[in-house]
């Protein structure tokens, strides 16, 4: 639910119908922006787009301050659809540029030959990071972003393919730290 006083979405409500957080997580905010941007970019229903537009306009300013990679990636994936319909929105273009650079800079700082990744660990919804960077690299005509995204995505796909050929996401009981062992169980449903 959107909190107009903070300009952020909240995610956790208790059984007593009270919010468990005053502001809301950046993950929840990024996911909400992704959903709203997809509605704005794809929906043919004017009423639905009007409702999404009001929330999107109120919620977007918070995205310019994102420093966490996953909320940035969620927002970027949504902005790809949004800018497909509204390519002249300078504020959205600026936010896309800043968040795409955030991802690319994280990759450049951390990636190594044996660890072509954005962070020193793999945790949850990992594929969204290269997904977002790939979309941005293609739409912004930035080959460096495309190359980094494809290197990371290829490595992740190999890493998360079990011996039998099936998908085996990183478990959340310890995740997978560089030079460590990947957690093979207790995967999250979001994967």
Question: Model-predicted segments: where are they?
Answer:
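Glycan-recognition and catalytic cores of secretory/periplasmic carbohydrate-active enzymes
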Residues: 1-191
